[in-house]
Amino acid sequence: VNRHKFLARGAAVSTAAALLLGVAGMAMADQNHGDQDVDVNVGITEVVDGGVLAMSVAGTATALTEDGSTPAVRQFKGTLPTVTVTDTRSPDEIPAGAGWYVLGTSTDFVGGAGQPAISASHLGWAPRVIDGGGSGQVTEGDRVDTSMDSGSNAVGLVDQELLALTQDSGAIASEGQWTANADLFLRTPATVAPGNYVAKLTLSLFE
């Protein structure tokens, strides 16, 4: 239990109570000679600069924990924080034929105690659209395996891999918002040096 936190909260309540008592004392001491209402008006104009296409990520970090390792390969899994794409533009603000897409690229994993770096090619993902809108025109990218795997997609998150996209921004703009995330997995040789590692995964929105 954080004792200082509760002490601070108690002090705040005491101060509020003292202020309320002071106001009550002044009200009883003075006679009310009438009330006058004042209308408070505000004019909010329409935004003339138009809407925007933007992306946000629900968090600045995620952790990978060991899961599914074998005698030859160590595996660490985690989840990409939810990525939200928002479009507040009207259809006439969107260029004909435009489509937006989100790409991800990772740096190498750097060891906190001077261990050899783990290449970004050892990090893969399996994208997943959470809310693709009513039209279903937002789709996830292909699974990207690691350099420890085989196949044409066994390249890791080395260079701008696709998380999600739509091929027609204008057609779905009225839906306003879409979300996606991805299962992350790091695969290394069993001989990898122990210790803490950190990498930076950059997500970019393009149209």
Give short role names for the model-derived ranges.
Residues 2-10, 19-207:
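Signature of Gram-negative chaperone-usher
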